[in-house]
Each structure stands twice: as structure tokens, then as C-alpha cells.
Amino acid sequence: MEYHGGSYDVIVIGAGHAGCEAALASARIGAKTLVITLNLDMIAFMPCNPSIGGPAKGIVVREIDALGGEMGKNIDKTYIQIRMLNTGKGPAVRALRAQADKVLYQREMKKTLENQKNLTLLQGKVERLIVEDGVCKGVITQTGAHYYAKAVVITTGTFLRGEIIIGDIKYSSGPNNQQPSIKLSEHLEELGFELVRFKTGTPPRVNSRTIDYSKTEIQPGDEEPRAFSYETTKYITDQLPCWLTYTTEETHRIIDENLHLSPMYSGMIKGTGPRYCPSIEDKVVRFHDKPRHQIFLEPEGRETEEVYVQGLSTSLPEHIQRKLLETIPGLEKAQLMRAGYAIEYDAIVPTQLWPTLETKLVKNLYTAGQINGTSGYEEAAGQGIMAGINAAHRALGREEIILSRSDAYIGVLIDDLVTKGTNEPYRLLTSRAEYRLLLRHDNADLRLTELGYRIGLISEERYQAFLAKKEAIEREKKRLQTVIIKPTPEVQEVIRQAGGSELKDGIRAADLLRRPEMTYEHIQKLAPADEDIAPEVAEQVEIQIKYEGYIQKSLQEVERLKKMENKKIPEDIDYDAIQGLATEARQKLKQVRPLSIAQASRISGVNPADISILLVYLEQGRIARVSNE
């Protein structure tokens, strides 16, 4: 029986990593928000690796936190291990990664949602959207409830027509044997959305008590206190190690002999898999010359014996998976607790979205997370917070928010999706960001906290602390520009010990800090500050002074880009009326409908000549409008 379930400002479908951020952002902004999810016990569930962060992804978590999101705070409360990666490299590629206690992570996130003002949680299955005259007005659940809203966000992950595949067995399912969402997928097609079939996979889990850890290498966490969130002040000290082992030639032989049983090679899997997270059979085939591959053994939590066998993602039959485990040092007698599997699911072609993550086809409808063709919890959460902000702003009549490629990795991610699309599950990499020196782990707050505060997601107390930090950085930079360090014997000794060449004359402290071998600690010894300098202030001062030339160069490029971003393209432009455009360019421009010349220039198939023609056309139109006025 159909009935009226209630009216809201925003409805979020799904409470995975995208849905949680979308719902919390919306509610915190002040929109009356409803989250409908298939299973309230699976909020923020980690169906694949029990970790948050890593290269590029860790920076996204920092950005979510700088905007006022939850993922960073939640992992800081629940990790079992944390490490800073790439510490031997430059600041642009450093990133934090934490192993999660996945059950605790879920529990804490559920608690946060339950206690959030303006937020209602509901277990249910959305099967249809209420769409009138191309505008989304709400949702209809399996039980016939009609819920109305001014904006709807779909964050259904890998549940849309999900199918699990192990060997020659294939059955309808969401991740981890949860119920899939079939009717909503069919309904999206009815509305005219183009869907694609993607695939992802997960490795087996084994019982920790049956692993011989003496045959593996220990991988401890960092002793230095670390956190994703700028608000975290308490650090977990009793960390659990991970362990490293390797596949063997015997592992590879078994895979080679049984490739015909792999659904990837038998033709059973039609969906495109993630390039940067290949299955073990894929690795063995593609890198046949490699005698071994790394396998990390990652505990899934403090209260469980389940261990995630990272690097052994597979959809081979279960009996073959058991044979593979027996060939890996340390896992010879490991008990299989859950078999690895592949999952195929529907995703929306993301060029059907505006940069706000609103769909072009249906107004007031937003999508975020794996439904948009991405892979990874962090990518999902980054889209979730932006979709939640924009949905709430639409409902409350506020301006839309779009992060540019020079603002954040989240901006790079969304721009790549809506401008270029993706023909495989999209993973964020540092190499995708042309301004990666500006988009660092250490400066996410300096880039985004101002915006988070303006939107209403950052508290006054946190904002004041942020302003104090900013002022302290500027004060110390100014001091180092004026203080002169003279070539005294003590100074020469410090420089010699650091591996540098001695001073001939006095030098400004900032210029000495620019030398590769010198650190801020050295400068503090030679020219101590009058005030206590917090470690995060010292870090910023050192990076900003050391890399000043490169940063300035990047900022000049950003200014050039902004000029192109400011050249707006009307939404209702008729590309068929523009003479001289190449056929491919015309087709791509009509499909993507870019909002600026900068976005148009990033579409594959649109050449500089096409951009010139487009610029002339827009200029002629502007002149015509001015003369008519």
C-alpha cells in the first residue's frame, strides 16, 4: 500500500562512505535530511580493504576534514595502525594511511549519524524516484512509502544490480552477501540515464591464529603521533602491526594452470575492472616476468581474528583459492574464513553530471561515490561531502559550490569524472593533479577551512584556531626574511654537520633554510624565535620557504587557468550553430556541456583550434548582446 512517509529538504539514498558525508554535510548546514539505507548495521561498511588513506587518497581525507566532514575524525578514533607514506620524498606526495578497525569504524560512524541534529535514519529500499517535469521531488520505497524532498542524493555504491562471482558461480548480491538494488537501476534507465557495467574484487580473509607470522616481515605503524583530522588531539598509541609476505613461483604456476576457471578470462565477467587494483590472476598474466608479488596481511580489527590478504584479490574458484594460500610463506596452514570474490555493478556515465554532481537529465538529483564510476572509500566520501553541500544549498536556496582543480584533489576527481568520463573504475592518483605541489597533505586546512567555515561546517572555535595558525605562519616567515645569521664558528659547525658548505658572509635565515640540507630545526638552533612555534606552523614555514619558487610558478599557472575558468559558456549554447567546429569536438561538447572555456579545453577530442572557434563565437555573441542593449 502506498502512503505519504514525510517531507524533507534532502534525501540521501545509501549510507556508505559517500552517503554518510552527504547526509552529515546536509544536516549540519541546516537542511532537514533523511538517509534511507538497506541495512542500518552496515553504515560506513568497508567491504574491501580495511584501511583509509594512501597516496592522493589520504590527502582527500584531509580535504574532507578541512571542509568539515567526518571521515578523518572517525578513522582517528578507530584505527589500529597509522603510517605516513613517502616520507623520503617531497611534500607533494606525502600521504597518511591508517588500518581501520572496520567494525569500530562502522559503529562510531553510525553513532555520529544517530546523534546528528536535522538527520533522520531509516532502513529501507528505494525503488523509484518521484520525477515530475524533469525535476526530482522525492523517492518511493519498497514498502510503498512516498518521501518528498527538494533535493535527492543517490549514493548506492556497488549495489545497483550487483552480482557476486566466484569461479563459475554467479548470483545477485550486493557486497559481502547483502541484498542488491535492482529496481532502482532499472528505474534510472527508464529515466534515460546511460549506465555502464563495472567490476571490482576483494581477496580472501584468513584466521589470524592459523598464520605462521615467523615467515613474514613485520610492518609496524609510526611511533610519532599522527592524525587525519585537524581537530584530533588524542592519539591511539597501542597499534597493531601488519605483516608482509610474497607469492611464490608455485602460486603463479597454479594461477597459470587454472586461468580457464577465472571468470575474468572465461568471459563470465563483462564489467571493466580497476586498472590500479588488479586481481592476482591479472598481475600474474600482465607481469609474467616477476617471480613474486607482495602480499600484506592486514588485521580487520581488535576484536576479530579475520585477516585481510591484501594483494591476493581474486575471483578464482574457492578450492583454487585454498591451494594458492598454501603456496604463500606463512599462510601454508591458514584457514580460509571468507573466499575472495568479484562483484559486477551498474554505474552512471559521469559525463551526465554537472560539476556540482547534479544530473543534467533530472534537476535536483545528485549522485556521489561508486555510482559515478569511482573506486575507493575516500573518493566516494569526497564526492559525498560535495553532493551533500550542493543538495542542501539547492534545498535552502543558496549558491552552488564547485572546487577547482587548483583547490583540491576533490576538485580534480570531480572535474575528471564530469569532463572526461571514465571507462574503468576511477582511482585518484597524485599524477592526475597538475597542481599537486599546491594540493598537499600538510596544507589542506589552508586551502579549504575558509570555505568550510563560510558554508557552516566549521565551528567558530575551530575557525579561530585556524586563523591563529595562519597568522603564526606569516609572522615566522616574516621573521626569517629579516633575521641575519652571521658566519660564527657555532653557525659553521651546525652547517657542516648538516652536510652544507660554510658561510662566507651573513645570510638571511630564510635564504639559509632554502638550502636542501638545512631544516627548520637547524634554523631554530641558529636563530631561535621568541615565541613557541607549534610543529604544524614550523612545517608550513619550512615548506613555504623551501619550495617558494616552485609554488609561485604553480600559482602563476593557476592564475592563467582562472582566466579561462572565468570565460563562462552559457548552458543553453547551440553547438550546431557554431561553424568550423570539428565533428568530434561538436559531439563531445554537446555531451559534456562544459560550463567554462577551461573545462571545454580538458575534454578529450576538443582541440585548441576548436577552442579558438568557440572563443570567437562567444565573443561575437557578447558584442551582439552589448550592441542590442
Curated annotation (Swiss-Prot):
The keyword Cell inner membrane does not apply. The keyword Ligase does not apply. SUPFAM superfamilies: FAD/NAD(P)-binding domain. Keywords: Cytoplasm, FAD, Flavoprotein, NAD, tRNA processing. It holds the Pfam family GIDA. NAD(+) binds at residues 273-287. One of its GO terms (molecular function) is flavin adenine dinucleotide binding. Its cofactor is FAD. InterPro entries: FAD/NAD-bd_sf, GIDA_C_N, MnmG, MnmG-rel, MnmG-rel_CS, MnmG_C, MnmG_C_subdom, MnmG_C_subdom_sf. NAD-binding protein involved in the addition of a carboxymethylaminomethyl (cmnm) group at the wobble position (U34) of certain tRNAs, forming tRNA-cmnm(5)s(2)U34. Belongs to the MnmG family. Homodimer. Heterotetramer of two MnmE and two MnmG subunits. This is tRNA uridine 5-carboxymethylaminomethyl modification enzyme MnmG. It comes from Geobacillus thermodenitrificans (strain NG80-2).
